[in-house]
Amino acid sequence: MFTKVKYIITKDNEIVVFGELMQHSDFRHLDPIRAGFMTFGVNSQGNPTPSCYGRSVSLQMDSDPEKDTLIAKRQLNMLDD
């Protein structure tokens, strides 16, 4: 099963994850530098793993899939072994 959520990345390279019913622009006060969507899947070891992608229309910001996914994995303690 895959779950899709939204996120922003702050200038301090911290990720804020929230549900699809909220707008990225609801977090404008946190001065985001990137924004997008995240899904959770299962890696080859059978552990949950995030994947970031896409663009925020409400903030007019793109994601950086590679960087944002690494930030998410670190902050959510889901680094691959």
Labelled PLM ranges:
Residues 1-81:
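Intrinsic low-complexity, intrinsically disordered or marginally ordered coil/linker segments
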